[in-house]
């Protein structure tokens, strides 16, 4: 016999012995024993055995028996008779009966009576009564609901703890930048209540707690709570656990949890499975999961189907799926649809979709609108869209704003945008920023080739080098010229050669000059010929 089986056997024997003791006492006329025995039989589901014991105890004035008799009658479908016994017990001071009576009245639409009895229960410290009162008050928008929800949570009601946490989360989000602490206090308290509810087995609280911990970088604990919630049947937690595992490099385990979540109707997990199979080249399986995501109400499924069809050259089907997602409000699908329409020459049809996507917050669509208007020669309108995209962090848009500001003579504003674009990785922006800074420098003293000169690199040189290292040919030529000016023949030759081999005529010509000065005239001639 396993220890757990032995423990259960011992517990069962103790319960049986206790029942015998209570039955003997009840048969001897002990009212409390009648009440306790009736409650034991009621919990076991023996309604026929429980009813005479509870009726006898109730007749003798036992309020707990009256409450339990109400529960028994309610289970048998005699709701009105049950309410009568609950009223007797509630008037005698039973908080549990007051709660049951309050719920009875609410189910029948009598809210004033429901509130009266639920308040009686809550004010006696009954957790279920406090929660039911809070729910009633919240339903009609009464601000007092929060007080009773908190009271129920403090008395151990897990759903109350969860709902209190959700309310605090909403307060933290609403407070945002307007509050003294940006909602930090509410968010911290919300986490505490999520933790309490999750510890009591609330699966959604465990999900939200996991999300908070993941956002904070506490991935191990986040994973534990996601796992707890997922095992209890929360599909969103299974999906989130899958993403954690994928990010940790365990794609196979991630797929197991995504499959579990997707089979339970989670569209996000179905999309993740679709993407996984698409990466493996299993397009038919990917398409099946994207369709499952769409059927689950996740509009990303239609968007991903569009992407899949576009990659396979199925343009008509791609357009169909993009349209479906775009009409459902998917901004990136609207942008993708506009690009597809542009590619087939329908600029008129593309513009409204770019606009719709941009207005919905698509940064790429705002940039694409800039390109569209610039192509029509509407520079002022194009600049407005570029500025909008640049303000949201779009690197190429920031470059275009920088170029426009340079053209307008607004060098400080141009420099600001070029710095943003260059910092975002644009080699063209790095080169143009370097030229702006270069123009401000006083001319450096000339040096003979081969003469070693040690100077601290200026900021403009650093930007030239960054652009050059990213393959920008004009930057490579300029870095070569700066190296030559310092007398560093080897470095100059390296950069000229890189530019020349990438097709730069200036790079080829300068490399030829350098080689000729070094006495390598035959090779110099080759590069001059290439320079044309």
Describe the residue ranges of each PLM region.
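Residue-level detector of the short coil/turn that links helix A to helix B
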Residues: 45, 77, 109, 140-141, ...
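Solenoidal tandem-repeat scaffolds enriched in leucines and small polar residues
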Residues: 112-173, 183, 187-215, 219-225, ...
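TPR/TPR-like (Sel1-like) alpha-helical repeat modules
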Residues: 121-124, 154, 327, 391, ...
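Conserved alpha-helical positions within TPR/SEL1-like repeat arrays
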Residues: 32-39, 64-71, 96-103, 128-135, ...
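Short helix-capping/linker turns of helical repeat alpha-solenoids
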Residues: 29-30, 60-62, 92-94, 124-126, ...
């Amino acid at each position: 016999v396993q220890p757990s089986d032995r423990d259960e056997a011992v517990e069962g024997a103790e319960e049986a012995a206790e029942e015998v003791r209570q039955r003997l006492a009840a048969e001897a006329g002990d009212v409390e024993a009648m009440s306790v025995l009736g409650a034991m039989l009621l919990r076991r589901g023996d309604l026929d055995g429980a009813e005479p014991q509870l009726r006898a105890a109730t007749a003798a004035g036992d309020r707990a028996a009256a409450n339990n008799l109400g529960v028994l009658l309610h289970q048998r479908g005699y709701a009105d008779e049950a309410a009568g016994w609950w009223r007797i017990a509630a008037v005698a001071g039973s908080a549990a009966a007051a709660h049951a009576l309050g719920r009875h009245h609410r189910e029948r639409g009598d809210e004033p009576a429901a509130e009266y009895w639920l308040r009686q229960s809550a004010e006696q410290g009954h957790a279920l009564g406090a929660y039911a009162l809070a729910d009633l008050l919240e339903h009609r928008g009464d601000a007092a609901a929060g007080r009773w929800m908190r009271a129920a949570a403090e008395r151990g009601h897990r759903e109350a703890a969860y709902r209190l946490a959700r309310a605090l989360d909403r307060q933290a989000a609403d407070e945002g930048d307007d509050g003294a602490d940006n909602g930090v206090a509410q968010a911290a308290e919300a986490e505490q209540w999520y933790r309490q509810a999750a510890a009591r087995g609330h699966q959604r609280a465990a999900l939200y707690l996991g999300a908070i911990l993941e956002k904070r970088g506490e991935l191990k604990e986040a994973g534990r709570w996601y796992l707890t919630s997922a095992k209890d049947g929360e599909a969103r937690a299974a999906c989130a656990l899958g993403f954690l595992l994928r990010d940790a490099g365990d794609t196979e385990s991630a797929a197991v949890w995504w499959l579990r979540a997707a089979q339970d109707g989670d569209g996000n997990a179905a999309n993740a499975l679709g993407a996984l199979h698409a990466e493996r080249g299993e397009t038919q399986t990917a398409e099946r999961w994207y369709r499952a995501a769409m059927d689950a109400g996740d509009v990303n499924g239609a968007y991903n189907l569009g992407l899949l069809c576009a990659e396979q050259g199925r343009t008509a089907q791609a357009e169909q799926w993009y349209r479906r997602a775009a009409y459902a409000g998917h901004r990136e699908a609207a942008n993708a649809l506009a690009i597809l329409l542009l590619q087939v020459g329908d600029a008129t049809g593309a513009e409204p979709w770019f606009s719709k996507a941009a207005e919905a917050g698509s940064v790429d669509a705002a940039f694409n609108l800039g390109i569209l208007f610039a192509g029509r020669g509407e520079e002022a309108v194009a600049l407005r869209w570029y500025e909008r995209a640049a303000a949201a962090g779009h690197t190429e848009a920031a470059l275009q704003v920088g170029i426009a500001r340079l053209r307008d003579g607004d060098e400080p504003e141009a420099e600001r945008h070029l710095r943003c674009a260059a910092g975002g990785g644009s080699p063209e922006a790095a080169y143009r920023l370097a030229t702006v800074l270069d123009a401000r420098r006083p001319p450096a003293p000339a040096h003979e080739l081969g003469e070693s000169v040690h100077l601290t690199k200026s900021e403009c040189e650093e930007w030239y080098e960054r652009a050059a290292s990213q393959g920008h040919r004009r930057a490579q030529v300029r870095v070569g010229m700066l190296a030559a000016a310092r007398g560093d023949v080897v470095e100059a030759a390296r950069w000229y050669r890189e530019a020349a081999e990438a097709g730069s005529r200036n790079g080829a010509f300068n490399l030829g000059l350098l080689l000729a000065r070094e006495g390598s005239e035959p090779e110099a001639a080759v590069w001059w010929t290439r320079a044309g």
